Amino acid sequence: MIILIIQGVSLCFLIVAVVLWGLYFPHPSPLIRRRLPPRARWPEAQIRKWLRRGSFQSGFLNYFYRDPERIPPVGNSILAPADGLVTSVEVHEGIRYLVIALSFWDVHVQRSPVSGSVVKVESKGKEFMDGEGRGFAFLMEKPCPVQQRVVISTDAGEIAVRLITSLAARRIETWVREHDAIVRGQRIGRILLGSTVVLELPESVYLLVDVGERVWAGETIVAQEMNSA
C-alpha cells in the first residue's frame, strides 16, 4: 500500500512537472527557476515578451528593483555612475566620453561619480531608440534618444552623467535637483530596464578602464585627475 502511495505521488509530481514545463517552454519552469542564475532564470526573450505585453513576473520585478548598498573606495577618484559593460571610450571636442551599457540583469540605480554641486539637470532628445549609446554620446538634440543629463561642478571642472532611454527603457527617475550638494557614490537616479549611461569627463582626466570591462556604480574607479595618477 505504501509503495502504491509513493508511486502515485511520484506520478502526480511528474505530471505537474511536465505540465509546467509545457506551459512555460521555452522558458524555465517555476520548479527550477529559483536554482538558476538570473540570466538563465529570466532569459532575454522572456523579458522582451513581457515588455510587449506590458506586464512582468513579480519575481523578476523584485530582482530588477533591487538597490544594494555600495561603499565607495577611499579617496577622490572618479567612480562608475552605473553598473554595466564599457562599450565605448572616446574624446570629442575636449570631452572624454565613457559609455556604459546596462543589461536587463544589472542594477539600474545610478550614482554620482564625484562629490560636488549639481549645476544643471536637463532633459534632451525626442525619440526612443535601441543601441549601446556609442552613436548617442555626442548628440544633444533630435535624433538623440530621450535622456536626462545631470551636470556636476567639481574642483576638476564640470562632469556630466547622461541617463539614456531605449525602446525598452522609456522611463527615467532623477533624484537630484539643481543646486543640490551631492557626495561621491550618492544615488542620483534610475533608468527602468536596460539602456545606456554616458559619463562625460574633462579631457585632462586619466581613464583607468577600457572597452569590454565591467563596472559597478559607486564602487569601480574609472578615472582620476592627471596630477593624481
Tell me the role of every PLM-derived stretch.
Residues 1-229:
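Contiguous, well-folded functional domains in the mature portion of proteins
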